[in-house]
Amino acid sequence: MTGSATQGIKTVLHPVSDLEKAKAVYSALLGVAPMADESYYVGFEAGGQHVGLVPGGGPQGLTSPVAYWEVPDIEAKLTEVTAAGATVKDSPRDVGGGRLVATVTDLDGNVLGLLQDS
């Protein structure tokens, strides 16, 4: 196998129907207050992981949690995974701070996130 190795799961996004109630549950679970608390997104850092809550699935239309794998080169990784049979769901986009995200679906329809920090 050639290509670039991932650097592990960086972020897991969870679609939620009630952001305030979900924020309370995840604060209790993780034992920390949110580090980002907006009407469109609540994010936590705990144990070296980022956990995000997205009301109504957000612009990505999430219907289940999505793990975002950190990669050194998002375009190269997209080329590798699509050559292996994945389909691009959302092309790379900058979500702020130089962070690029994209999603693909595997052969069974599972959504996989890719994340590149600059």
PLM-predicted stretches and their roles:
Residues 1-5, 8-17, 45, 59-118, ...:
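Vicinal oxygen chelate
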Residues 1-23, 48-50, 65-67, 117-118:
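N-terminal beta-strand motif that seeds the catalytic metal site of vicinal oxygen chelate
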Residues 14, 35, 92-94:
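Short beta-strand-to-loop elements that line the ligand-binding cleft
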Residues 20-29, 102, 111:
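Conserved active-site alpha-helix within GNAT-family acetyltransferase domains
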Residues 23-24, 41, 78-79:
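Short glycine-/small-residue-rich flexible loop motifs, especially phosphate/cofactor-binding loops
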Residues 29-34, 85-87:
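Conserved acetyl-CoA-binding loop of GNAT-fold acetyltransferases
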Residues 32-65, 111-116:
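Conserved short beta-strand elements that form part of the metal-binding/catalytic scaffold
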